[in-house]
């Protein structure tokens, strides 16, 4: 069973690490990400999410991004979900 942490910073870091692994499995990296969509249960946490996002992406050439506040995610303990669309050249 995966332990879920109750803070958005820890969950965001874990999601970005999961995305990084998925990208690497296809010989891609964050420079290949064209779009990120953030689903948060509390949109006021977006500044924390952005700070962590900026550790993974090229902030001079960031992917298109959207953020959506949702009432809840598939697991009651989740605070954030991130959808990443990458383009392989």
Task: Name each model-derived stretch.
Residues 1-89:
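Short, polar/acidic, helix-capping and beta-turn segments at strand->helix junctions
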């Amino acid at each position: 069973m995966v332990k879920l942490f109750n803070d958005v910073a820890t969950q965001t870091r874990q999601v970005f690490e999961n995305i990084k692994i998925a990208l690497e499995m296809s010989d891609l990296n964050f420079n290949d990400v064209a779009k990120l969509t953030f689903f948060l249960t509390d949109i006021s946490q977006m500044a924390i999410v952005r700070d962590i996002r900026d550790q993974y992406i090229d902030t001079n050439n960031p992917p298109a991004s959207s953020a959506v506040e949702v009432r809840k995610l598939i697991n009651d303990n989740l605070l954030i979900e991130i959808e990443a669309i990458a383009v392989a050249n």
